[in-house]
Amino acid sequence: MANLDLSKYGITGVTEILHNPSYDVLFAEETKPGLEGFEKGQVTELGAVNVMTGVYTGRSPKDKFFVKNEASENSVWWTSEEYKNDNKPCSEEAWADLKAKAVKELSNKRLFVVDTFCGANEGTRMKVRFIMEVAWQAHFVTNMFIRPTAEELANYGEPDFVCFNASKAKVDNYKELGLNSETATVFNLKTKEQVILNTWYGGEMKKGMFSIMNYMNPLRGIASMHCSANTDMEGTSSAIFFGLSGTGKTTLSTDPKRKLIGDDEHGWDNEGVFNYEGGCYAKVINLDKESEPDIFNAIKRDALLENVTVAADGKINFADKSVTENTRVSYPIYHIENIVKPVSKGPHAKQVIFLSADAFGVLPPVSILNPEQAQYYFLSGFTAKLAGTERGITEPTPTFSACFGAAFLSLHPTKYAEELVKKMEMTGAKAYLVNTGWNGSGKRISIKDTRGIIDAILDGSIDKAPTKVIPFFDFVVPTELPGVDPKILDPRDTYADPAQWNEKAKDLAGRFIKNFAKFTGNEAGKKLVAAGPKL
């Protein structure tokens, strides 16, 4: 199959194409002698290869653009003065220049072409072709997307979307093109193409295609979600976990008592919940074999570590964050033992869990939400942004990211809320807000307590527990749950002086109210104000 013709993309003089290379070929290619700089992979003591991504150790949201043309003009959620987001417009002229730069970089080279699927449902999946010159980038997309069988590859035909990764090329004339820097990640919805220039961060390819699924699916009545998902062992019901980076999506959905559907990107259609991906992209800072055995054990041959500190003899130091807090590993989903097979999809969700890591120490560890509160807190998408998932952020700061994933939303946030609510109403799913962050003790709520809370949500015991209502937010919270320290369930009890909680709660409630004002431009948004905090 290596007789692909790339000249239709403008790529010429290709000396060799490695088309969907095997893991063994990828391993040999990314560790071969003579590789320099960020192309070089280092074999670690666990068998996985580690690579470094240079100055970009996270996505670069300031460098994300959509070409403004008839395909995008009236549908994309463009950034505006009233509501800033990452969907910045780029001209057709700038696109032509950027595409030419990418094509020039990839011409006269030995290339990797990886044909993948995005979306586990055959009827709505997207065929995505990645073209790159760097072996480990081909490894990354092989891990992260759905790998076609030999038969599917033979009948693959033309892709629905093409990503050109020219990480070695720079946009030196970015000012005259109206861009932000020498780096660019740009999408063209008319030609169905993405170009990546001057960033080596693997996540740009993964999240790029997520932005595209987030564009297409809601327009065809499918909820598109930045969440992890799992099912009970019998496969009778699913649970979904929304949350921003570092709030526990991967950790909490990877559960020995449940089967994993996926850890980050899903759709919910009339049949149920399905994964967009074929792999996981887990944070590994301070990874500990005892508290996260599944993720630790997934780090073996074929897994790909990013920006982890590795000694010359291959010894890994997971605690070292000198390069970045956002150290990662990508691995094919079958590296996790308990997964839904053969296709990563499950039945309708019965529980919808919103994860927030609250650095203010205000939110209860778990709140039972009514339907209006569910919409309010989904649109608010609150967490304290944790260190290092994006450039230039190292201290926890409050973040409101609509639908727990504003960075990846290509349509207006209310569209995602609308589709999610439709599915929840159809199936009678319940919503819960879980704080995986801090409380008045100054310590982070333990993974053990959070797992106990998740167990109580999934086995229904939370719905039978005695409850009380927390002021300012009107959250209904349980006063006791099996296996959870009862002293943490009311956050006021974790403060030496409960008045401290009151003060912080007022501050946080005010932030929610101020943030939600941007959704009150229409009737639906106005109606939800009453479900939010009150001062």
UniProtKB/Swiss-Prot annotation:
Substrate binds at R59, Y201, K207, R328. Its EC number is 4.1.1.49. The gene is pckA. ATP binds at residues 207, 226, 243-251, 292, 328, 444-445, 450. GO terms for molecular function: ATP binding; metal ion binding; phosphoenolpyruvate carboxykinase (ATP) activity. Belongs to the phosphoenolpyruvate carboxykinase (ATP) family. The keyword Cytoplasm applies. Involved in the gluconeogenesis. Catalyzes the conversion of oxaloacetate (OAA) to phosphoenolpyruvate (PEP) through direct phosphoryl transfer between the nucleoside triphosphate and OAA. It catalyses: oxaloacetate + ATP = phosphoenolpyruvate + ADP + CO2. GO terms for biological process: gluconeogenesis. This is Phosphoenolpyruvate carboxykinase (ATP).
